[in-house]
From Swiss-Prot:
This is CD4+ T-cell-stimulating antigen. InterPro entries: BMP_lipoprotein (IPR050957), Peripla_BP_I (IPR028082), PnrA-like (IPR003760). Residues 1-22 form the signal peptide. The keyword Cell membrane applies.
Amino acid sequence: MKKRTFALALSMIIASGVILGACGSSSDDKKSSDDKSSKDFTVAMVTDTGGVDDRSFNQSAWEGLQKFGKANDMEKGTDGYNYLQSASEADYKTNLNTAVRSDYDLIYGIGYKLKDAIEEVSKQKPKNQFAIVDDTIDDRDNVVSIGFKDNDGSYLVGVVAGLTTKTNKVGFVGGVKGTVIDRFEAGFTAGVKAVNPNAQIDVQYANDFAKADKGQQIASSMYSSGVDVIFHAAGGTGNGVFAEAKNLKKKDPSRAVWVIGVDRDQWDEGKVTANDGKDYNVTLTSEIKRVDIAVEDLATRAKAGDFPGGTKIEYGLDKDAVGLSEHQDNISKDVLAKVEEYKQKIVDGDIKVPEKP
């Protein structure tokens, strides 16, 4: 009798434990689910082949994302903000899918070359939020398009180049021919001609955004032909333009050779110590495109629940998102005054800057 009573009591205790265990498991599962649904906002960007250290477009975007992360006490990584670097165009789709699997709330594609990959992945993943920088994707509620009036900013550096050249020869080095770089070339050419109709403009393309050696080769040819100011819109390829200008300045400090940078202030890229022991800078100015402002701005809106999917946000002179960089030591006051004059005419609509060469 005692054995039967003990067995019955033991069975009840075991049963109670199972029930409590089941209840505990259910509670844990619910807690885990709640934790996931209430997780902090996360954001990532996929670079083009230039990478975050290209000293140009991608780097500017990454600086904007870092600023957003720090302002919101976020850490770099899958639980905060991060980037995925693309070594080749084949990596675009792979990196976007990796970002989706990592459950980022907002995923940027940095550069127009990621358009096709963003279009495909965003269609397959309609619940994820994406942004394409420097291109437009229409009729997609989970994609925001970010654009810049590059032609307006390029017009202003064209004014600087046209008024600064002593040889009446200036150059333009493009990365890859296309809609975006067309705007840089068209604006620059129009700006030069507006103030110096007799200037010759040598336009060449490297067909790559990440080949500094090609950029240096083109720059060498241009400078040898008498060009004294080169505007590059070529990402990492433009580093070669700076390298060539610095080599020439180092050998002959009296020679006037200038580079106009792009996307971010490239003043530091122009620093050089010449053979006379003195320090110089071959950066005339830079045509800034505040990708950092755009990236930070959209991330802030998305975090607040204001993701404007299906729209295009365009940044221009009116928002100081394009224009000349802060370092202007190598530009005369008279030239800067002309720049302000033409800037106001563009903002007022008195000058319509072309988008195609």
